């Protein structure tokens, strides 16, 4: 333990908080509640992204009340936590926590700190690691007095509100971009004219295949685990995010398409030196505007993949799926207009995502200082 700050008290975790033992049995309880599973809680942010209903479940769940704190004990490294805004039930893999020596608003931030996460990850079970309360409950922490708990919780909740507003803005921008992209890139039924277009463009669009307009279609050569920490170049697998590696096999402007896995058909655009997994398709040397093609594939490639899967084909992309993909093209000038506009929207979204990460970093720094007593908030902080 660190030096005890003035006015703070050292307690074992079992004296700081308790785990609720209330259970919901769908075979006996008839009232319907919102049910939170681990997948409904966003990692690291405490944001709830949905729920199911207790009437639709068949297993015993934990009961929680508004104001109690939920903490995912399964794979605690995922950092899933939520301050309940309603009464409900949740997965048995989620602890329902209530403060004993602390108020719940403070407890919500207490469980997010690095020291708590460290002991939570001294877990039991190899394949399905779970936090071990019998071990954790005996670990001691320094706790501030009640009035300081309130000030700390208030300060951190303001950062959370800023973070949540930024996330909502990202979601709104992404919804807008998806909607306008679909209208700009989808032709009316039986016609070669899009649902929406910029002023000054009236010509019909022309259908071409990717093979017609892309001179270089190949895959990467590497295994998916070839990534290297702190590598110099991007390494694209079939995931949504890229990794790093110290060697490159491609240099230039390219579209990359995930060829299998959970994100089959996901489309990346990159300009520079990079490497790729052996099931990632790399498309280079286009005769049409590459950004227009990228955004067109974002909208329409998944639809083609789904049709082929419904015919019984295995859920991965073969080369002919790429080559035979039909794209409707306007004039090069209109392609550039559409691609440029959508890339500007993407740039706005990327800037907001960077802002989101900066806010998360600011929150981590504030938690470190406030929850250790390194920084103390004065009585009239609010």
Question: Regions from the language model: what does each represent?
Answer:
Residues 9, 52-53, 59, 64-66:
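Residue-level recognition of short, solvent-exposed, well-ordered loop/turn junctions
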Residues 33-52, 69-93, 104-109, 117-123, ...:
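Short, ligand-facing micro-motifs at secondary-structure edges
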């Amino acid at each position: 333990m660190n030096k005890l700050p003035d006015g703070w008290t050292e307690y074992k975790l079992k004296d700081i908080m308790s785990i609720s033992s209330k259970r919901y049995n769908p075979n006996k309880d008839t009232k319907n509640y919102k049910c939170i599973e681990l997948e409904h809680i966003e990692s690291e942010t405490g944001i709830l992204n949905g729920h199911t209903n207790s009437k639709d479940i068949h297993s015993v769940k934990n009961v929680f009340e508004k104001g109690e704190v939920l903490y995912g004990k399964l794979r605690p490294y995922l950092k899933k936590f939520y301050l309940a805004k309603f009464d409900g039930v949740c997965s048995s893999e989620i602890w329902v926590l209530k403060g004993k020596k602390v108020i719940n608003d403070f407890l919500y931030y207490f469980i997010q700190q690095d020291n708590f996460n460290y002991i939570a990850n001294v877990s039991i079970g190899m394949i399905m690691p779970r936090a071990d309360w019998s071990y954790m409950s005996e670990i001691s922490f320094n706790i501030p007095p009640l009035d300081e708990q309130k000030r700390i919780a208030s300060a951190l909740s303001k950062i959370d509100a800023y973070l949540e507003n930024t996330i909502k803005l990202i979601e709104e921008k992404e919804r807008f971009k998806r909607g306008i992209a679909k209208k700009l890139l989808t032709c009316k039924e039986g016609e070669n004219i899009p649902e929406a277009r910029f002023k000054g463009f009236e010509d019909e669009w022309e259908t071409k295949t990717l093979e017609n307009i892309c001179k270089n279609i190949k895959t990467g050569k590497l295994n998916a685990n070839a990534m290297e920490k702190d590598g110099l170049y991007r390494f694209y697998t079939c995931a949504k995010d890229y990794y790093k590696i110290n060697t490159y096999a491609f240099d230039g402007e390219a579209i990359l398409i995930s060829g299998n896995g959970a994100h089959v058909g996901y489309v990346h655009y990159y300009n520079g030196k990079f490497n790729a997994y052996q099931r990632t398709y790399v498309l280079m040397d286009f005769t049409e505007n590459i950004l227009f093609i990228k955004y067109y594939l974002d909208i329409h490639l998944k639809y083609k993949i789904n049709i082929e899967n419904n015919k019984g084909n295995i859920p991965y992309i073969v080369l002919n799926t790429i080559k035979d993909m039909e794209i409707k093209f306007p004039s090069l000038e209109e392609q550039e207009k559409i691609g440029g506009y959508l890339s500007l929207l993407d740039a706005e979204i990327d800037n907001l995502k960077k802002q989101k990460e900066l806010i998360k970093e600011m929150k981590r720094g504030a938690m470190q200082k406030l929850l250790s007593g390194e920084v103390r908030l004065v009585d009239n902080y609010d």
